[in-house]
């Protein structure tokens, strides 16, 4: 039995080393990837040229139409768009501008929150800082924010930073990543998930409070630093969803 096993092992080893490498094919693959790549052009057409591409938005349609046209131009047959189901409302920014006018003029970097409402033209109003962190805080603002611009403070860290924004992964870190088990358990514990769900529920309650109290506009500070901030969606895209209050997101330094 031992001899049979040794024979098979040697036979497989010989076959493995006998395979010839097609260097010409490898060269052509490298040539296409390194010198003839269209990745940058494709990315430009789908992003900068098409604009924001929320589902069912005009920007999404522009990007999809370009993709069909490009695929057809490359020789693919029957490149078409197919409807996959009923999504809901589309959304896009038509015009957006925000500024502080007193005690002096200051332009604010702010972006409308996806699927929130508009203002139907320029608006102005008194600004109120909303600080609701627990149930007892709601009483403090009842009847005090109607028709006002409500500023919701950001929880982001705005302290100065002294480390580079980017860094290279060391060989030791790469070795540790390579040894990480496949399918390793989530870094989020049940307690962390429960806390996240509780924060989401409380945030929705605050949103409904702002609607009930008839705030004119909401401005929220978002996570980010050095003037860069991350945007998100703030309302339902369902076709039958009620209109949402107008809402902007701004850099944490402004909130």
Give residue ranges: language-model regions:
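Positively charged n-region of N-terminal signal peptides that target proteins for export
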Residues: 1-4, 19
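Noncatalytic luminal/extracellular "stalk/propeptide" segments of secretory-pathway proteins
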Residues: 20-21, 44, 48-184
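A gly/proline- and charged-residue-enriched helix-loop-helix capping module
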Residues: 175-199
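Loop-rich non-cytosolic ectodomains and luminal regions
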Residues: 190-194, 198, 202-203, 207-255
